[in-house]
A protein has these predicted regions:
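Bacterial N-terminal signal peptides that target proteins for export
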Residues: 1-9
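Bacterial N-terminal signal peptides
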Residues: 8-18
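Sec/Tat signal peptide C-region and signal peptidase I cleavage site
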Residues: 18-24
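Amphipathic, charged alpha-helical segments and their helix-to-coil junctions
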Residues: 24-207
Length: 207
């Protein structure tokens, strides 16, 4: 029993000593990455560009939809005219063939719309991904530079969440928070139209 107590005591001492060493060697800073990303003027610029691109796609799609509706109207008229009892058999046959050709055209427009939707979605997603990666890389590089200059060995994202959508950090102080400093430098040369007054409070962790 005494032996077990001694072992437990030694273990506690070693763990405590190790904790002291780790704390002495590490200087930790915090950063609300979601707030930095959302408030960075280039993110706002990218959002505007994506919306403009989406509007262009929507305009093209609407033109295709209009063509589709027009073709359907023409098809219905051809079917009605082909059933006209006053026309000759040859004329009826001709109109039926015209209706069949118009139906093929309609099917082609449908296929084009489906392909267009797929291509537009892929294009927008890829553009969004490229912009996001580029912006995050700029943020990471600045954080890395700032952290090294200030002697920080670790920068923790306070907006991070677990797979269960709960905060990774339940408590932390803002003594070494880099959020506002990083944002100030990122937006130092921002065009005025992209700047808005920044809140001093951090946003909720990103989901």
């Amino acid at each position: 029993m005494k032996l077990i107590s001694k072992i437990v005591l030694v273990t506690v001492i070693l763990l405590t000593a190790g904790s002291v060493v780790v704390n002495a060697q590490n200087k930790i800073a915090t950063l609300d990455l979601r707030k930095v990303f959302d408030s960075y003027w280039r993110t706002k610029q990218a959002d505007i560009q994506l919306k403009e691109r989406a509007k262009e796609f929507e305009k093209q799609r609407q033109e295709m939809i209009d063509s589709y509706k027009s073709a359907n109207d023409e098809y219905k008229k051809l079917i009605d005219s082909a059933n006209d009892s006053a026309i000759t058999a040859d004329e009826r046959e001709k109109r039926k063939k015209d209706a069949e050709a118009k139906l093929v055209e309609i099917k082609g427009i449908e296929a084009n719309i489906t392909q267009f939707d797929r291509t537009a979605t892929t294009t927008l997603n890829e553009q969004r991904k490229r912009m996001r990666e580029k912006i995050l890389q700029e943020i990471y590089e600045l954080v890395n530079t700032k952290a090294k200059a200030a002697g920080y060995t670790l920068v923790i994202d306070t907006a991070a969440e677990t797979i269960n959508n709960t905060p990774v950090l339940l408590y932390y102080t803002k003594d070494n928070d880099l959020t506002d400093e990083i944002l100030k430098q990122l937006n130092a040369n921002a065009p005025t139209e992209y700047l808005q007054p920044q809140s001093t409070e951090t946003n909720a962790p990103a989901k």
